[in-house]
Design a protein with these regions (language model features):
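Surface-exposed acidic/polar loop and edge beta-strand patches at domain peripheries
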Residues: 2-195, 199-201, 212-215, 222-397
Length: 397
């Protein structure tokens, strides 16, 4: 369903006639009908905002935070977010229909640093590709989630295009990793925001440029704002073959350590206790991870959502053929409130040695590429009902 196939004037007409769930959530996209590309460099960003694209409701505005970090604000009539092209293509301050959906943190703007924990306020981080997560005992050190979170991109661009889903604003670029005699690969993500939509479509091309096979790990860390009463629905069976709690151990007997240790034991016995957010009875201080191995629909897509008490839901879907796992990450400390509803991943929340031992690396032969695809956004009540029905069908309920 994510493949590009077909073109012509009838494409948009066909999309308008397709079933609502398929059109709104997982519309089959045809060939790109047109795209006007606007390249930019770091010199475009200053204290005075510059509008790089303005086409109806689709806008892209370059500016620079007082911390010196370059930001590109992209928006349509219902959605707004800031992409950091030279800081890992991180996505900050996402709003849909005026609702802030980004994790609560102590960071009111991105800081000019490459240390993960000193700048952890974004909605979205690309992670990998040599490693993911953090190094475990006995492993050589590597940065938290490796090089992608703070990668400096080249060939950066924005622009407006048309495909069978309609008109969209795109932002993208390419990061090239070179390590003499070892690694040579490129990672090229693109974000697409369509007119009138609260759904963002993303893809990332991984290209092995070396004459030897490339083994890579990948993860996309999307951090939503926690909402008490939020209820999780997901296309992973609730059994030990598909769900694994990773209890947090702080290594001491402080009240904080004891509280999360005890909660971790309860979750390990019954992971469904985490399926409805409740800050009065649950402990996610400092954080907790639950690993899920997802089942997919007929198109290879995994689905996960958090239904909101007031109606609607936060939603994530992705092509699980290259990323069969997803982490549910929870951090609710009072100062922070972040929930990774589904963090698509090639493997689990463990270090790289564990991933290798369990066969979680993807492999690309010389010159080959993979395309990773995923979507995230805000669903209304009808769309939420359709998504839940899709999940039920996958699980045979």
């Amino acid at each position: 369903m994510f493949e590009f196939a077909g073109a012509g004037a009838s494409v948009l007409e066909g999309a308008a006639r397709s079933p609502a769930f398929k059109r709104v959530l997982l519309g089959e996209r045809g060939a790109e009908l047109s795209f006007t590309r606007v390249g930019f460099t770091q010199s475009f960003f200053s204290d005075r905002p510059i509008e790089l694209v303005s086409d109806g409701e689709l806008k892209a505005t370059a500016f620079r935070y007082e911390t010196g970090v370059a930001g590109l604000r992209v928006q349509n009539s219902r959605s707004s977010m800031v992409v950091l092209p030279y800081m890992g293509m991180q996505v900050w301050f996402v709003t849909f229909d005026g609702r802030n959906v980004t994790q609560k943190s102590m960071f009111d703007m991105p800081l000019a640093t490459t240390k993960f924990g000193d700048n952890y306020g974004a909605f979205l981080y690309h992670c990998g590709l040599n490693n993911v997560n953090g190094p475990e005992e006995g492993e050589d050190p590597y940065p938290m989630h490796d090089v992608l979170p703070f990668a400096v991109y080249e060939n950066t661009y924005t622009g407006v295009g048309v495909d069978e889903e309609g008109r969209y604003l795109a932002v993208g670029g390419t990061y090239v990793f070179r390590n003499s005699q070892e690694l040579y690969w490129a990672y090229a993500p693109e974000l697409r925001l369509y007119e009138g939509k609260t759904m963002v479509e993303m893809k990332a091309t991984v290209h092995n440029r070396r004459t030897h096979p490339l083994e890579y790990l990948w993860l996309c860390h999307m951090n939503w704002l926690g909402v008490d009463g939020g209820r999780f629905y997901y296309s992973a069976p609730q059994d030990p073959d598909h769900v694994l709690v990773a209890p947090t151990e702080l290594g001491n007997d402080s009240p904080r350590a004891v509280a999360i240790r005890e909660w971790g034991r309860k979750l390990a016995s019954d992971p469904t206790l985490a399926d409805v957010l409740d800050s009065s009875s649950q402990v996610y201080d400092p954080e907790m991870c639950i690993n899920y191995r997802y089942e997919t629909d007929e198109d290879g897509l995994a689905h996960s959502l958090m239904e909101l008490p007031g109606g609607g839901s936060y939603y994530v879907a992705w092509d699980a053929t290259k990323a069969p796992y997803a982490l549910r990450w929870l951090c609710r400390t009072g100062d922070e409130d972040g929930v990774g509803i589904a963090v698509p991943s090639t493997g689990t929340n463990r270090g790289s040695s564990y991933q290798r031992e369990h066969g979680h690396f993807n492999t690309l032969e010389p010159g080959e590429s993979d395309v990773l695809r995923w979507r995230f956004g805000l669903l209304d009540e009808r769309e939420t009902s359709d998504a839940k029905a899709c999940i039920d069908a996958i699980l045979g309920r």
